[in-house]
Swiss-Prot record:
Chain segments carrying region Phosphoribosyl-AMP cyclohydrolase: 1-117
Gene3D superfamilies: MazG-like (1.10.287.1080), Phosphoribosyl-AMP cyclohydrolase (3.10.20.810)
SUPFAM superfamilies membership: all-alpha NTP pyrophosphatases, HisI-like
Extent of the signal sequence: none
Matches recorded under PANTHER family: HISTIDINE BIOSYNTHESIS BIFUNCTIONAL PROTEIN (PTHR42945), HISTIDINE BIOSYNTHESIS BIFUNCTIONAL PROTEIN HISIE (PTHR42945:SF9)
InterPro entries membership: His_synth_HisIE, HisE, PRib-ATP_PPHydrolase-like, PRib_AMP_CycHydrolase_dom, PRib_AMP_CycHydrolase_sf
Domain of life from the UniProt record: Bacteria
Encoding gene (name): hisI
Protein name: Histidine biosynthesis bifunctional protein HisIE
């Protein structure tokens, strides 16, 4: 977490009339969750608590996001933009961020973003790990055990390869979707995620 004094000195407070626009982004999915404002005190409280604290322009007071709902925004990282007049905060949200109950205040657009969909699918798959096997195919798959899940990944991998060899694009898309889904289940079964895979890809890219 950045030092308050150092960060505070960088901010162009006069330029923003002492109310700094703050963009909140999901640290895992990169989904934009909401926009709020901070004054000097709200920024300090945020850094002290590790949770996002805004200045409410309507209530004219500080308010910690989630103080009533429990849907806190836990700060992972933050950065000023190139003009030092907007702050980006990467956060781990506890529950939905929007007061309407949606995950994001920009739900109409964000839910259609490809990587956001994958991240939400991953969360849904994880939520089915301990569910009744009669409630969904995913829960039944988890109940069948690692060997069966791995077998399904192998089967879908072969079917994906076959679809590619016969140059059937539509079938390739369908089989690749099945493969990605079953791979997601296999990763979840091992308490891993696509983030772990991406980290390995990044590591190899640097080499």
């Amino acid at each position: 977490m950045q030092n308050f004094k150092e960060l505070n000195e960088k901010i162009a407070w006069q330029k923003v009339d002492n109310l700094l626009p703050v963009i909140i982004q999901d640290a895992k999915t990169c989904e934009v969750l909401m926009l709020g404002f901070m004054n000097n005190e709200a920024l300090e409280k945020s850094l002290e608590s590790g949770k996002v604290v805004f200045f409410s322009r309507t209530k004219q007071r500080l308010w910690m996001k989630g103080e009533e709902s429990g849907n806190f925004l836990n700060i992972i990282d933050l950065s000023l933009d190139c003009d030092n007049d907007t702050l980006l905060i990467l956060a781990n949200p506890v529950g939905p961020t929007c007061h309407t109950g949606d995950i994001s205040c920009f739900e109409k657009i964000s839910k259609n973003a490809d990587f956001v969909f994958l991240a939400r699918l991953e969360k849904l798959i994880n939520a089915r790990k301990n569910a009744d096997e009669n409630t969904s195919y995913t829960a039944k798959l988890f109940k069948s055990g690692t060997k069966r899940i791995a077998q399904k990944v192998g089967e879908e991998g072969v079917e994906t390869a076959l679809a590619a060899t016969v140059k059937d694009k539509e079938e390739l898309i369908c089989e690749a979707a099945d493969l990605m889904y079953h791979l997601s289940v296999l990763l979840a079964d091992a308490n891993l995620s696509f983030s772990d895979v991406i980290s390995k890809l990044k590591e190899r890219h640097k080499a």
